[in-house]
């Protein structure tokens, strides 16, 4: 038995088989206070629809802030936000930093490679030391599923935690910004058919999107991909599974494309990228199978010529760059809700 960076023995992701959709460390709902208010954002799973809608409604208000000449509000003035990214990130880290700055927070980006964790310090010891510096909010991305839960469980009572992606488990702010994007273009969730396409097995975004879509009442969620890249447990959540892209895309209103997460694959699950594109790539011809006003989304990073054709990515039905723009407002909303009150 080994000791990992969290300070615990064993594998931090061992609570769940990678083939299953749900994770075993979700006990109760540690992200809510006794009064049902949001203290941490760790997962969309288990969040009441009212809280999800409250976040989306609050984000709507912050969209106008991003369009102003002075793009700041004083909601987190005097608060310290620590961005702790133990995995690489461009969009998520940058938009969290922009969001915190626009809320007037003091922002610190921890250089993980130069931190004491690279010298063997456990994750919890790192968190305890940063808490002693009077941190108010930790934004955490970690390769181990459940790491943000561990931090939320052991951090000081006044500290809030936002999960910016943990292993294969969850990426709740991406899920929320995806829901905001869908609501912006489609308005009524209860009349939609949404397809998620690609490497769903390794995708924390897919898990968060599926939980969010079902919470918001989407009547038909489709998971489309090779058998080797689809987790078990999807049908039990009411998700329709397709192993043929053309069949799965027929009549859908929203298409969410996912990249191949080769860094999380332990074996040869697929042929070459070229062969993958022939079978699973979203081309203009395949997009034509969807509803005429369907929108195309992608959480990024995007691999052109692998899961999506450039004509689609840059075409009139693509809202991919708008997702990034909306992500700032959504992350402002999340940080404002969890840490904006006087603790």
Swiss-Prot record:
GO terms for biological process: 'de novo' pyrimidine nucleobase biosynthetic process; 'de novo' UMP biosynthetic process; amino acid metabolic process. It comes from the Bacteria. GO terms for cellular component: cytosol. It catalyses: carbamoyl phosphate + L-aspartate = N-carbamoyl-L-aspartate + phosphate + H(+). Carbamoyl phosphate binds at residues 91-92, 141, 171, 174, 300-301. L-aspartate binds at residues 119, 204, 259. Its EC number is 2.1.3.2. Signal peptide: none annotated. Keywords: Pyrimidine biosynthesis, Transferase. Belongs to the aspartate/ornithine carbamoyltransferase superfamily. ATCase family. Catalyzes the condensation of carbamoyl phosphate and aspartate to form carbamoyl aspartate and inorganic phosphate, the committed step in the de novo pyrimidine nucleotide biosynthesis pathway. NCBIfam families: asp_carb_tr, PRK00856.1. This is Aspartate carbamoyltransferase catalytic subunit. It comes from Burkholderia multivorans (strain ATCC 17616 / 249). The lineage of its organism: Bacteria, Pseudomonadati, Pseudomonadota, Betaproteobacteria, Burkholderiales.
């Amino acid at each position: 038995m080994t000791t990992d960076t969290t300070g615990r023995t064993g594998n931090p992701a061992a609570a769940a088989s990678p083939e299953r959709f749900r994770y075993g460390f979700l006990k109760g709902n540690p992200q809510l206070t006794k009064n049902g208010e949001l203290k941490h954002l760790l997962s969309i799973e288990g969040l009441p629809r009212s809280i999800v809608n409250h976040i989306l409604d609050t984000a709507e208000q912050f969209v106008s802030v991003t369009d102003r000449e002075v793009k700041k509000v004083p909601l987190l003035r005097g608060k310290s936000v620590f961005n702790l990214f133990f995995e690489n990130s461009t969009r998520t880290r940058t938009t969290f930093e922009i969001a915190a700055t626009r809320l007037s927070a003091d922002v610190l980006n921890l250089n993980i490679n130069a931190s004491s964790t690279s010298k063997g310090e456990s994750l919890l010891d790192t968190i305890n030391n940063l808490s002693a510096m009077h941190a108010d909010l930790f934004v955490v991305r970690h390769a181990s599923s459940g790491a943000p839960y561990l931090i939320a469980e052991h951090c000081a009572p006044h500290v809030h935690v936002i999960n910016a992606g943990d292993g294969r488990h969850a990426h709740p702010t991406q899920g929320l910004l995806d829901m905001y994007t869908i609501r912006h273009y489609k308005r009524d969730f209860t009349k939609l058919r949404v397809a998620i396409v690609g490497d769903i097995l390794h995708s924390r975004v897919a898990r968060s999107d599926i939980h969010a879509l079902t919470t918001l009442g989407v009547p038909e969620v489709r998971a489309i991909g090779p058998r080797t890249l689809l987790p078990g447990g999807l049908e039990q959540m009411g998700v329709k599974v397709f192993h043929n892209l053309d069949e799965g895309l027929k009549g859908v209103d929203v298409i969410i494309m996912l990249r191949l997460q080769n860094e999380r694959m332990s074996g040869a699950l697929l042929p070459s990228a070229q062969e993958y594109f022939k079978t699973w790539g979203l081309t203009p011809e395949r997009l034509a199978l969807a509803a005429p006003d369907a929108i195309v989304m992608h959480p990024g990073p995007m691999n052109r010529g692998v899961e999506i054709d450039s004509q689609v990515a840059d075409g009139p039905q693509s809202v991919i760059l708008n997702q990034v723009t909306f992500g700032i407002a959504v992350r402002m909303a999340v940080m404002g809700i969890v840490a904006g009150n006087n603790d």
